From Swiss-Prot:
Residues 210-230 have a biased composition (Polar residues). One of its GO terms (biological process) is spindle assembly. The lineage of its organism: Eukaryota, Metazoa, Chordata, Craniata, Vertebrata. Keywords: Acetylation, Cytoplasm, Cytoskeleton, Microtubule, Phosphoprotein. One of its GO terms (molecular function) is gamma-tubulin binding. This is Gamma-tubulin complex component 3. It is found in: Cytoplasm, Cytoskeleton, Microtubule organizing center, Centrosome. PANTHER family: GAMMA TUBULIN COMPLEX PROTEIN, GAMMA-TUBULIN COMPLEX COMPONENT 3. The keyword Hydrolase does not apply. The gene is TUBGCP3. Component of the gamma-tubulin ring complex (gTuRC) which mediates microtubule nucleation. The gTuRC regulates the minus-end nucleation of alpha-beta tubulin heterodimers that grow into microtubule protafilaments, a critical step in centrosome duplication and spindle formation. Ubiquitously expressed.
């Protein structure tokens, strides 16, 4: 039966050393001393207490055994276990399971290889303890007992044993501790169990390097491995005062920092917003600087991860924003893949226990090299995150696209890849819009905006607009406008024209960007492939829309009808209409009835070439009475109207029709002046022969003829200017533009330019208000002349009628054989004639006043024309005063026209 001494931990430890090395007790004294120091030291547990690290080891082991299903099941079970708070020491349970799963048949091969490793390595690492031989029964191994005696001896194991290797790296021999001298065993009860636990854990750590015996460690390799493990022992060892941290400890901390997790010695400083090595750590400056440089990856990782975490749950961020976050997550996954490789490398070194040399270990300098490219990628991503703050939709895509304009091909390829992911939703919106006319933009990311409150009649003008801030920078404004027009044309056809033709018949639909890779391929050829798709859809859709408007809704026919009726282009119709309306329009405006005027309009249509127009056009032609003011006649309130609805109302909007109404009133008034002067000339021709027997009246008639001739010249020049220089020239430009128009917007724009030109040159704009007032004053003087001439002719004809009656009465009496006149009758007749002759100077005076006012107004009108910014109006002044009649009367005209003439001669 074995004695108690033979069962003591000391004896068992010595037997273990002899068994491993295969030598006698005297030959293993040196190794036994090292084993005693290891067991008696304050090393921390050799296995990292990391639950997830152990879980990863278990999964890797299952995968290595080709048990992928079990690995997936284990991952799910571990997730459920982690979410429950029933178990406190989950790491211990997982580590136990991992230990139990090890194959016991592999142990003999380990021991055979450990023997060589143990025999070669320990003599070099035990030089801090003197060689001596003591009975193993006398060696106390309890750390508590040793610590109690450390106060009595300055050479205790705690200060001179293996625990000091981490600080001084086995700096030299030390005196033998008194506690290890023979005969001083003072073990406490239960020390055997404690020793077994310490022995198992220490040797499990020391003897884990599964290396072939033929590969002997070098003198440089072992201290490196021991130094790595010494640092691990400090984590639960010395915690007071400054600590010396080795590079291996920094490497492990850095790998955690790379993931945004604080290490034991490197932590995030929230005040300075950076990672810092703790101040109490005793670390060389080079290692500290290198650690700080490497920690920048953790800061960059945190910045990117914080952005994605905040935005991933924000639904209002939109599809483009979510794509950006997905692109960032994809890059982070690649980054995590690198970290997993580094962790595997570090874990492999930990699993081997003792390193073979520095050339295969993970160092800070190697990390600097391996993380150079990832750092550039993270810096680029962090810069993108900063630049994209507060942006969404197309604006976000523009921000990403701005970073593709760099000379660094590595950075450009990265950003282009992200851009292909970010722009994929934008291109999906775009193709859905240009091929289907559908706009599903819940978060307002697309550059085409829709206003659901707009009614159908304003669909083309107001319903769809461009969000300029959302236009991606890789698209031009012309491309954006075409994209807007394509979808707008499709919706206009469906909703306004009620044309349900499928878009596949209008457009040759090409393959759209169905994936980010398709989008990336498209971006490589923006000027050809992308532009070609947009141009094809634009031309085909616009052409189809214009064909529908022209063939089905007769857009061009309605435009020509506007020219003929509202702009007085149908001359025979307008003249006949004036003749028919004259009896009605001379009456007060309050006595007019619209149905009477409508009947006259229909009569004029049937009596002229207007009857050959399309019934659809004639149906829209109508009479409109303007608002009546006191004293207005029918001429002042009468107007023609043209009803528009449906698709053509998109071109002829209410604003356009109001412009047509203003122009019609102006042209109608000018045409009326021409009509009045024509009547005046007729009166001259008809009454000239009748009043030939009244020589005293010739002066009045002469003044009337002169003033009427001036007015006729003025009106003829104005009519020529309005008809040819304004209407015909503008209409010719409009018609050419309409024939060449590629889309409906071109027609609308050309039509608006046409109306604006007419409004401006017909003196109806705000800048020509003074000219228009003078022109209206001229028109008023023409009406005054008509009234004055009518009164003069009326008085003259009445006088002529009386004289003829007197002569007829005289002849009748002579035939009857009576005296022709009596003295009293002759005297009365002479008196009446004398009174009439006395009224002639008043008539002449009235005509002179009228002439003076008229000429003054014309002179002021000419002065305003010469100072106009419109060159055509300045040229009009030359035609109105072609013989310089007004120039001789107005000094301002002499200066203005003379200066203008000299300028013209110089040019």
């Amino acid at each position: 039966m074995a004695t108690p001494d033979q069962k003591s931990p000391n004896v068992l430890l010595q037997n273990l050393c002899c068994r491993i090395l295969g030598r006698s007790e005297a030959d293993v004294a040196q190794q036994f001393q090292y084993a005693v120091r290891v067991i008696g030291s304050n090393f921390a547990p050799t296995v990292e207490r990391d639950e997830f690290l152990v879980a990863e080891k278990i999964k890797k082991e299952l995968i290595r055994q080709r048990r992928e299903a079990d690995a997936a099941l284990f991952s799910e079970l571990h997730r459920k276990l982690h979410s429950q708070g029933v178990l406190k020491n989950k790491w211990s349970i997982l580590y136990l399971l991992l230990s139990l799963s090890e194959d016991p048949r592999r142990q003999p091969s380990k021991v055979s290889s450990y023997a060589t490793l143990f025999a070669q390595a320990l003599p070099r690492d035990a030089h801090s303890t003197p060689y001596y031989y003591a009975r193993p029964q006398t060696l106390p191994l309890s750390y508590q007992d040793r610590s109690a005696q450390s106060a009595q001896s300055s050479g205790s194991v705690g200060s001179s044993g293996i625990s000091s290797i981490g600080l001084c790296a086995l700096s030299g021999p030390a005196p033998a501790p008194q506690s290890l001298l023979p005969g001083q065993s003072n073990q406490a009860p239960g020390v055997g169990d404690c020793l077994r636990q310490q022995l198992g854990s220490r040797l499990a750590w020391t003897l884990t390097a599964n290396q072939p015996s033929s590969q002997a460690t070098t003198s440089k390799g072992v201290p490196s491995a021991v130094s790595r493990n010494m640092t691990r022992s400090r984590r639960e060892g010395d915690t007071g005062g400054t600590m010396e941290i080795t590079e291996a400890a920094l490497v492990r901390d850095i790998l955690y920092v790379f993931q945004g997790i604080d290490g034991k010695n490197i932590k995030m400083n929230n005040t300075e917003n950076c990672y810092k090595v703790e101040g109490k750590a005793n670390l060389s400056r080079s290692l500290r600087d290198t650690a700080v440089r490497l920690s920048e990856l953790g800061w960059l990782h945190n910045k990117i991860r914080r952005y994605t975490d905040q935005r991933s749950l924000d639904r209002s961020f939109g599809l483009v924003g979510q794509s950006f976050c997905a692109a960032l997550h994809q890059e982070l996954r690649e980054y995590y893949r690198l970290l997993s490789v580094l962790h595997s490398q570090l874990q492999l070194e930990d699993d081997q226990g003792v390193n073979l040399g520095l050339e295969s270990s993970l160092t800070l300098r190697r990390l600097l090299v391996w993380t150079y490219d990832p750092k550039i990628r993270l810096k680029t991503l962090a810069a993108l995150v900063d630049h994209c703050q507060g942006r969404k939709g197309g604006e976000l895509a523009s921000a990403v696209h701005a970073y593709t304009k760099t000379g660094d091909p590595y950075m450009r390829s990265l950003v282009q890849h992200i851009l292909s992911l970010v722009s994929h939703p934008v291109l999906s919106f775009l193709y859905r819009w240009i091929y289907d006319g559908e706009l599903e933009d819940t978060y307002h990311e697309f550059f085409v905006a829709s206003d659901p409150t707009v009614k159908t009649d304003r669909l083309w003008h107001d319903k769809y607009t461009l969000r300029k801030s959302m236009i991606p920078s890789f698209m031009t404004m012309d491309q954006s406008r075409k994209v807007l027009l394509i979808g707008k044309s499709i919706n206009f056809l469906h909703q306004v024209c009620h044309d349900q033709t499928p878009t596949t018949k209008m457009i040759a639909v090409t393959k759209s960007a169905e994936s980010p890779q398709d989008a990336a391929d498209l971006f490589t050829d923006l000027e050809n492939a992308f532009q070609g798709k947009i141009d094809a859809a634009y031309f085909e859709t616009s052409k189809y829309l214009l064909d529908v408007l022209n063939k089905k809704y007769s857009l061009l026919d309605h435009m020509q009808a506007m020219r003929r009726y509202l702009l007085l282009g149908q001359g025979d119709f307008i003249r006949h209409l004036m003749d028919l309306l004259k009896p009605e329009l001379v009456r007060p405006a309050t006595t007019l009835y619209q149905h009477n005027l409508t009947g006259i309009l229909e009569t004029a249509v049937r009596a002229t070439n207007a009857q050959f127009d399309s019934p659809e056009i004639l149906r829209r032609l109508d009479v409109r009475l303007l608002e009546v003011s006191p004293g207005d006649t029918g001429w002042d309130v009468f107007s023609l109207d043209y009803h528009v609805d449906g698709p053509i109302a998109t071109v002829f909007t209410r604003e356009c029709m109001s412009h047509y109404l203003r122009v019609f009133n102006f042209l109608w008034r000018a045409k009326r002046m021409e009509y009045i002067l024509t009547d005046i000339r007729k009166g001259h021709m008809c009454n000239a022969k009748l009043l030939r027997n009244m020589p005293e009246f010739s002066g009045v008639l002469h003044q009337c003829h002169i003033l009427a001739s001036e007015m006729v010249h003025f009106i003829h020049q104005m009519q020529y200017y309005i008809t040819f220089e304004v209407l015909e020239c503008s209409w010719d430009e409009l018609w050419n533009k309409v024939q060449q128009a590629q889309d409906l917007d071109h027609i609308i724009a050309a039509h608006e330019v046409f109306l604006d030109t007419i409004i401006s040159r017909c003196l109806l704009d705000s800048d020509s208000r003074a000219l228009l007032n003078q022109l209206r004053a001229v028109f008023d003087q023409i009406i005054e002349l008509q009234n004055a001439q009518d009164a003069i002719y009326r008085a003259a004809l009445e006088e002529l009628q009386r004289r003829l009656q007197f002569e007829e009465k005289k002849k009748q009496r002579e035939i009857e054989g009576q005296w022709g006149v009596t003295a009293a009758e002759e005297e009365e007749e002479n008196k009446r004639i004398g009174e009439f002759k006395e009224s002639i100077p008043k008539m002449c005076s009235q005509l002179r006043i009228l002439t003076h006012f008229y000429q003054g107004i014309v002179q002021q009108f000419l002065v305003l024309l010469t100072t106009s910014s419109d060159e055509s109006l300045r040229f009009l002044s030359f035609r109105l005063d072609f013989n310089e009649h007004y120039k001789a009367r107005e000094p301002r005209l002499r200066v203005s026209l003379g200066t203008r003439g000299r300028r013209s001669s110089h040019t």
